[in-house]
Curated annotation (Swiss-Prot):
One Pfam family matching this protein: HTH_3
Domain (HTH cro/C1-type) ranges: 6-60
Organism ancestry: Bacteria, Bacillati, Bacillota, Bacilli, Bacillales
Lineage: superkingdom: Bacteria
Isomerase listed as a keyword: no
Keyword check for Ligase: no
Residues in the DNA-binding region annotation: 17-36
SMART domains named in the record: HTH_XRE
Single GO term (MF): DNA binding
InterPro entries registered for this protein in UniProt: Cro/C1-type_HTH (IPR001387), Lambda_DNA-bd_dom_sf (IPR010982)
Keywords for this protein: DNA-binding, Transcription, Transcription regulation
Taxonomic source organism: Bacillus subtilis (strain 168)
Identification of the protein by name: SPbeta prophage-derived uncharacterized HTH-type transcriptional regulator YonR
Amino acid sequence: MFGERLKKCRTSKGYSQQRMADFLGITRQGYGKYEIGKAEPDLKTLTKLSNILGVSTDFLLKGTHAQFDLDEILNDPETLIAGYNGMISEEQAKELLYYLLKKEFEEH
């Protein structure tokens, strides 16, 4: 259930409900409703939650991790850290992306 996963992620980070509410700009009671299943966050809030907690939105919603085809991503230069705009080499971008994906899968 979404609320249970949300609470587990929050407590594993050592965050209180109040701290999460502060991060999101809502009341503690409003945040608490997410954890007990009385309310569901909108897409913008869900994205914020996933970023704060370091998990995917798929994990929060369904308990599953997004599936990545690592070889496809690593072999497509256009998808490799496009925001770097030539500041790093393609090989460095591949290494960075591999590290980030590996870290994400190890944490979950």
